[in-house]
C-alpha cells in the first residue's frame, strides 16, 4: 500500500511562523505522529506532500523511508495528492492521510484499508452531533454513497446530514491518477477537491465503502491553537489511561504530561503535575513526587524523586533519593542508595553507593566514591574561564560545609575536609585537611543603632 500524507497547508489560523504540521503534540511535531501511524501499516511507499515551509518541514521529519512531493501552490487536496502520484506504485492502493490529524489509530486505518480491497474506494466517515464545517456524506435511499459535498457548497437539506467526511480515503492508485487529472475547481473555494473523486469513482462503477473510527477524536484536526490544546489533552488522557491499565498509580490522571516514551515497572507511583520528556524509564517501585520534570532519564528500582526536582539525562540507582528541589543535569549518575537533596545540582558527575549531598551543593565534572558525605554549601570549582576540569573524591571522605574543590584535584580515601576549606591541592588518604584560620573575639563591641529620621 502507498501512503500519502498531506502537509502543505499554511495554517493561517495558528497565527504562527511555524508550519502548522510542526506544532508540537506531546513534545513532537503533529506530522511525526502521523508518520509513525503510517509506518505501523508497513507501506511500500510513504510520501509527504509539503508546501508552506517546505524545507523546514522536510528537515524536521526527514528519514530514509520518507519521500517528499512539493505542492508549490495550495490549490486543494486533490491537487496536493496529484503531486505525489509520480512517487507511488500504481499497482498498490493509496491511503491518504493528513499531517494535522495526529490521533487516528492504526487499527482504524487498517479496517478502512481492508474494506477497500478489490478495487473499492474507501472513505473514513464519522457521525457528529454538530457537523458544522465538514463535508457531508450524501447517500441514496439504499444507503449507498453518491457524493461528498463540502460545507460551502451544500444545500440546506445536505447541511442537515450528520455523517461527515474525514478526508481519509483509500483508492486504487491507477484509477485515482486518472480521476485526479479530470478534476475541476468549479466550487466556492476554486480548489481541486479530493472529495470530488468519489463521483468519478461511482460513474466508473466502483463501490464506495465507508468505515468509522471507534472514537470521534481519532479524526479531529488542528486548525487553531485552541484545537491543538484540545488534542493535547485528549492524547495525554489516552496515555494516562494506558499507564493506569499497566498498573501505574497516578495521583490525578489529568495532571501528567508524557512528551516522549515513559516505560514503567510494577508499583510505580507518580504524583501530580509531573512532565516526562524523551525516553524515560521508571523501574519497579519508583516514586515520583509532585511537580517534577524528568527528561531522558533512567531511574532504578525503589528510587524516590521528591517534589519539584528536575532530571535531565540522568541515571539514578536503586533506592536512591533525589530532592526535593534537586537538579540532575546530563551525565549525572547516582549509584544505589545515594542521596541528593534540596538545592543540590549535579552535572556530568558520579555519586557513589550510599554517598550523600543533602543541601545547597554544586557537583560538576566530579567522580565521587562510595559513602561520601558532602556538607552543605560544597562547590566543585570546575571551570577556569576557558576549560573544565574534574574533581575526584574517593570512598569514605567526609566533606564539611562551605567547602570548595578547585579542580583538577584528587582527595584520597578516608579524608576529612574541615568546614570552610578550599582544597586546591591533592590530598593523600586518611588525612585531615583544613585551611588555617584565626578566630578573634573582642569584648565591648556595640552594635550600630539605626538613625532616626
Swiss-Prot record:
Q: Does the keyword Acyltransferase apply?
A: yes
Q: Which UniProt keywords apply?
A: Acyltransferase, Cell shape, Cell wall biogenesis/degradation, Cytoplasm, Magnesium, Metal-binding, Multifunctional enzyme, Nucleotidyltransferase, Peptidoglycan synthesis, Repeat, Transferase
The catalytic site is made up of 359 (proton acceptor)
Q: Where would you say this protein principally sits, based on its record?
A: cytoplasm
Enzyme Commission number(s) of this protein: 2.7.7.23, 2.3.1.157
EC class, as a word, reads transferase
Q: Where in the cell is it found?
A: Cytoplasm
Chain residue ranges for the region called Linker: 226-246
The cross-references to InterPro entries, in alphabetical order and at most eight, read:
Bifunctional_GlmU, GlmU-like, GlmU_C_LbH, Hexapep, MobA-like_NTP_Trfase, Nucleotide-diphossugar_trans, Trimer_LpxA-like_sf
Is-annotated flag, keyword Flavoprotein? no
Per the record, what are the reactions this protein catalyses?
Answer: alpha-D-glucosamine 1-phosphate + acetyl-CoA = N-acetyl-alpha-D-glucosamine 1-phosphate + CoA + H(+); N-acetyl-alpha-D-glucosamine 1-phosphate + UTP + H(+) = UDP-N-acetyl-alpha-D-glucosamine + diphosphate
Pfam name, any one: Hexapep
Swiss-Prot/TrEMBL cofactor(s): Mg(2+)
Annotated residues that bind Mg(2+) are located at 100, 223
* Cofactor binding comment, as recorded: Binds 1 Mg(2+) ion per subunit.
Where is the stretch described as Pyrophosphorylase?
1-225
Positions of UDP-N-acetyl-alpha-D-glucosamine binding: 6-9, 20, 71, 76-77, 98-100, 135, 150, 165, 223, 329, 347, 362, 373
- Metabolic or biological pathway, per its Swiss-Prot or TrEMBL entry: Nucleotide-sugar biosynthesis; UDP-N-acetyl-alpha-D-glucosamine biosynthesis; N-acetyl-alpha-D-glucosamine 1-phosphate from alpha-D-glucosamine 6-phosphate (route II): step 2/2; Nucleotide-sugar biosynthesis; UDP-N-acetyl-alpha-D-glucosamine biosynthesis; UDP-N-acetyl-alpha-D-glucosamine from N-acetyl-alpha-D-glucosamine 1-phosphate: step 1/1; Bacterial outer membrane biogenesis; LPS lipid A biosynthesis
A Gene Ontology biological process noted in the UniProt record is:
lipid A biosynthetic process
Spell out the molecular function terms from Gene Ontology.
glucosamine-1-phosphate N-acetyltransferase activity; magnesium ion binding; UDP-N-acetylglucosamine diphosphorylase activity
Q: Give a short account of what the protein does.
A: Catalyzes the last two sequential reactions in the de novo biosynthetic pathway for UDP-N-acetylglucosamine (UDP-GlcNAc). The C-terminal domain catalyzes the transfer of acetyl group from acetyl coenzyme A to glucosamine-1-phosphate (GlcN-1-P) to produce N-acetylglucosamine-1-phosphate (GlcNAc-1-P), which is converted into UDP-GlcNAc by the transfer of uridine 5-monophosphate (from uridine 5-triphosphate), a reaction catalyzed by the N-terminal domain.
Family that this chain belongs to: In the N-terminal section; belongs to the N-acetylglucosamine-1-phosphate uridyltransferase family.
Matching entries from NCBIfam families are given as: glmU
| Name listed for the protein in its UniProt record | Bifunctional protein GlmU
Q: Which organism is it from?
A: Burkholderia mallei (strain ATCC 23344)
In the UniProt record, what gene is named as encoding this protein? glmU
Amino acid at each position: 500500500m502507498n501512503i500519502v500524507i498531506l502537509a502543505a497547508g499554511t495554517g493561517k489560523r495558528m497565527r504562527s511562523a511555524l508550519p502548522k504540521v510542526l506544532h508540537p503534540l506531546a513534545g513532537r511535531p503533529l506530522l511525526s505522529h502521523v508518520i509513525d501511524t503510517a509506518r505501523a501499516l508497513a507501506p511500500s511507499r510513504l510520501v509527504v506532500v509539503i508546501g508552506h515551509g517546505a524545507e523546514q518541514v522536510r528537515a524536521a521529519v526527514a528519514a530514509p523511508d520518507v519521500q517528499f512531493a512539493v505542492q508549490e501552490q495550495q490549490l486543494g487536496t486533490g491537487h496536493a495528492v496529484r503531486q505525489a502520484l509520480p512517487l507511488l506504485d500504481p499497482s498498490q492502493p493509496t491511503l491518504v492521510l493528513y499531517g494535522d490529524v495526529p490521533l487516528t489509530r492504526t487499527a482504524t486505518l487498517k479496517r478502512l484499508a481492508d474494506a477497500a480491497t478489490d478495487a473499492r474506494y474507501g472513505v473514513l466517515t464519522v457521525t457528529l452531533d454538530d457537523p458544522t464545517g465538514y463535508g457531508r456524506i450524501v447517500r441514496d435511499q439504499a444507503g449507498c454513497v453518491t457524493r461528498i459535498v463540502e460545507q460551502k457548497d451544500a444545500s440546506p437539506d445536505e447541511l442537515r446530514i450528520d455523517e461527515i467526511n474525514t478526508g481519509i480515503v483509500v483508492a486504487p492508485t491507477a484509477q485515482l491518477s486518472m480521476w485526479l487529472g479530470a478534476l475541476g475547481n468549479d466550487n466556492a473555494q476554486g480548489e481541486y477537491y479530493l472529495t470530488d473523486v468519489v463521483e468519478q469513482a461511482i460513474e466508473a462503477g466502483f463501490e464506495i465503502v465507508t468505515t468509522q473510527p471507534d472514537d470521534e477524536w481519532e479524526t479531529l484536526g488542528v486548525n487553531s491553537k485552541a484545537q491543538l490544546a484540545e488534542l493535547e489533552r485528549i492524547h495525554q488522557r489516552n496515555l494516562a489511561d494506558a499507564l493506569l491499565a499497566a498498573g501505574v498509580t497516578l495521583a490525578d490522571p489529568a495532571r501528567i504530561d508524557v512528551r516522549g516514551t515513559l516505560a514503567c515497572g510494577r508499583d510505580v507511583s507518580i504524583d501530580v503535575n509531573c512532565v516526562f520528556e524523551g525516553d524515560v524509564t521508571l523501574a519497579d517501585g519508583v516514586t515520583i513526587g509532585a511537580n517534577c520534570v524528568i527528561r531522558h532519564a533512567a531511574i532504578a528500582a525503589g528510587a524516590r524523586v521528591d517534589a519539584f526536582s528536575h532530571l535531565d539525562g540522568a541515571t539514578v540507582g536503586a533506592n536512591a533519593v533525589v530532592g526535593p528541589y534537586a537538579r540532575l543535569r546530563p551525565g549525572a549518575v547516582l549509584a544505589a542508595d545515594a542521596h541528593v537533596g534540596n538545592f543540590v545540582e549535579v552535572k556530568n558527575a558520579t555519586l557513589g553507593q550510599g554517598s550523600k549531598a543533602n543541601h545547597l551543593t554544586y557537583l560538576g565534572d566530579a567522580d565521587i566514591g562510595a559513602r561520601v558525605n558532602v556538607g552543605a554549601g560544597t562547590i566543585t570549582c570546575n571551570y577556569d574561564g576557558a576549560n573544565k576540569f574534574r574533581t575526584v573524591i574517593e570512598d569514605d571522605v567526609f566533606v564539611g560545609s562551605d567547602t570548595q574543590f578547585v579542580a583538577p584535584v584528587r582527595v584520597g580515601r578516608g579524608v576529612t575536609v574541615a568546614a570552610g576549606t578550599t582544597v586546591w591541592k591533592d590530598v593523600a588518604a586518611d588525612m585531615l585537611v583544613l585551611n588555617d584560620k584565626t578566630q578573634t573575639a573582642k569584648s565591648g563591641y556595640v552594635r550600630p543603632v539605626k538613625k532616626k529620621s
